[in-house]
Amino acid sequence: IRLSLVGSEMCIRDRYEGSLWSRGILPQDTSKMLRDERGGHVEVDESSSLDWDTLRARIKQHGMRNSNCVAIAPTATISNIIGVSACIEPTFQNLYVKSNLSGEFTVVNDYLVRDLKKLGLWDEVMVADLKYFDGSLSRIDRVPSELRELYATAFEVEPSWLVECASRRQKWIDQAQSLNIYMSGASGKKLDDTYKLAWLRGLKLSLIHISEPTRLRRI
């Protein structure tokens, strides 16, 4: 809406005419276009709860200032610097040492620390356990099961759920999203299943590298 207002107050972007925006096609409409192009084989929930027709009409009348509005880029290093989670990424580990060109620094899940302190469980033994188990709570029995589930690390989250979440986001994104898929004990079948699921959900995947969880130290 804001970019449509800017387009009406200033001017629309170059080469607006002929774009998807000028034809009243919003990001969530493109899954149907992909289905028509494929002749089916796109399993995406296309339901919505807001009045998008009004926005379509406004954009067709006033245009858009930008060619794209939303893109989700990799944010791992930035999030570490400012002390927040990495946007759409699952937590890599609850405690680990990160290495990059600037050196090495320790990353701790502050939200986990807060919850463990409330339960009186944050102590030197807990820190030692997290180091020993590579930042995972799964084998620390004194941590309540609900916390172990809540703070599951990236390699403990089933990859299919990451794909499902990406699919639900993508229909509202007009550019693209960057998402890492983590696999513990990756196999040819696991990779094939993940690629096929992503394809059915209207996503694209690119394989950059595969690393085992215990060996993944450089990020």
What kind of feature is each model-predicted range?
Residues 1-7, 209-219:
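Single conserved hydrophobic/aromatic residue that forms the stacking wall/gate
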Residues 21, 25, 29, 37-49, ...:
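Catalytic alpha/beta core of large soluble enzyme barrels
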Residues 12-14, 209-210:
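Short amphipathic alpha-helical motifs in flexible or low-confidence regions
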Residues 8, 28, 34:
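Active-site-adjacent "lid" and substrate-binding segments of diverse enzymatic cores
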Residues 10-11, 76:
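Active-site loops and adjacent core secondary-structure elements that bind or stabilize anionic groups
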Residues 55:
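Glycine/serine-rich anion-binding loops at beta->alpha junctions
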